[in-house]
Amino acid sequence: MMARRDPKSWAKRLVRAQTLQKQRRAPVGPSAPPPDEEDPRLKCKNCGAFGHTARSTRCPMKCWKAALVPATLGKKEGKENLKPWKPRGEANPGPLNKDKGEKEERPRQQDPQRKALLHMFSGKPPEKPLPNGKGSTESSDHLRVASGPMPVHTTSKRPRVDPVLADRSAAEMSGRGSVLASLSPLRKASLSSSSSLGPKERQTGAAADIPQPAVRHQGREPLLVVKPTHSRPEGGCREVPQAASKTHGLLQAARPQAQDKRPAVTSQPCPPAATHSLGLGSNLSFGPGAKRPAQAPIQACLNFPKKPRLGPFQIPESAIQGGELGAPENLQPPPAATELGPSTSPQMGRRTPAQVPSIDRQPPHSTPCLPTAQACTMSHHSAASHDGAQPLRVLFRRLENGRWSSSLLAAPSFHSPEKPGAFLAQSPHVSEKSEAPCVRVPPSVLYEDLQVSSSSEDSDSDLE
C-alpha cells in the first residue's frame, strides 16, 4: 500500500501545508500592540516617540506603511476665521471703499476745539455753515490753508555778504596769503605783495610780520618801526633777502639829495636766532635820510633755543639812532666802519618811544653776546651806485661753532682797504658791502640748516 503512493503528490501536499503555515504566521494588517506592552518611560531614538524603543517593531520608522496619520485634537472656534474675505476687484468695491467715498462726500464736521484753535491762530471769526452745505466746504479749505507764520525753507543759495565785510575778509585773506607765500625757503618776495595789502595793513605791515623771539622778555616785544611808503621811491627800491627774520626786503632810497630833509630814527629788534629761512618777511620801504645821523651801538640779542640748533642767523642791523628815541649811547663810527658800505637812514613811523622798548636786552643764558655793529653813514658815491638795476647778493659764511653769518654784497663803487679781522667782527651782522673772500657752502647743507631752524621756530610758536 505504501509503495503504491505517488511521491509527487506527497511533495505537493507538503508544499501546500508550508504555504498555509507561512500565511498564518505573517500579519495581515497593522495591529495595535496591547496596552501592557507600552512603557511611557521609554523613548525611541529613531522617531523620538515615547512608549517604545528603536528595536521595537512598533516604531513607525521601521514599518512606515503601518504609521498612522495623527488626528487633530479639535477645532478652536475662537481663533479660526470662519468667514474669510474674498479678493475684491475694482468693479466690486468692498464696504471699506464705500465708507470712504461716503465720508468724502459728506461735509467735514468741525468740533468746537478745532474752531477755537482756528480763531486763535488766524484771527478770523469762524464762518457759520450754510444749510445747503456750501459753507462747510469753504471752511474746510480755510483749515487746509493756514494763515499763521510759514516755516522757513532753507535753499542752497548763499546769503549775500556785506560789501564792507567782504572787503575786510578779502584783505585778511590776502595778508594771510602773503605770509604763507613767504614761508617757503630761499624765495624772494615781490614788490606787488606790499601793494596788494590795504592801507591799514600797509601801515602796520612792518610791525606785524616781524616774528617774536622765543625767549620771553618782560614787557612788549621790540619791533622794527618804519614808515612804509605807498609808492615806489624815486631812487629805485632793492629787495634784500634777509636770514633769521620775516623781513626779507629792504627798499633803499638811493637819491643823494634826499638826505638833508629831516632827521629820522628806527629801533632795531632783538632778532630770534635761526628762526626762519631765507626769503621770509614783508617789503619795507624807507623814507629819505637825515642831515646829521648819530651812531648808536646795536647789541645782537641772540634768541637761544631750547635745544641746540644748526644754522642760526643774525638780522642785519643798520640803524641810525636819533633824538626822538633817546639812545643809551652815542658813539662816532670808526673810519674802518664808515667805509664798509652805504646805509640809509630809515624814516621813523608813527610810533612812540613807549611802544619801542630798549634794544640792549641781555639773553637769559650766560653766553656773551656778539660784538656790536656800528651803523655806517651814507656817501654820495655809494648811493649813486645803487641807482642802476644791479642785483644784490648775500654771502653766507659758516663759522667754527656751527653758526652761520650772512653779509650783503653790492657792486663796488669805491675800494677801501679793509682788514680781514674787521669782516670777522662784523660777521654776525649783515653789512651792505664786503670785500672778504667768498666761502662757498653746498646748498644742501644750507637748506638743511634752514629747515631745522624753521621747524624749531614753528614748534616754539605752537607752544606759546
From Swiss-Prot:
Regions of biased composition (Low complexity) lie at 180-197
Organism superkingdom: Eukaryota
This one is known as Protein FAM90A8
Q: Which organism is it from?
A: Homo sapiens (Human)
**Residue ranges of the region described as Disordered:** 1-42, 69-389, 415-437
Name any one Pfam family assigned in the record. Answer: zf-CCHC_6
Disulfide bonds listed in the record: none
What InterPro entries does the database record attribute to this sequence?
FAM90, Znf-CCHC_6
**PANTHER family registered for this protein in UniProt:** FAMILY WITH SEQUENCE SIMILARITY 90 MEMBER A11, PSEUDOGENE-RELATED, PROTEIN FAM90A1
Composition bias of kind Basic and acidic residues appears in: 74-89, 97-114
> Record's family?
Belongs to the FAM90 family.
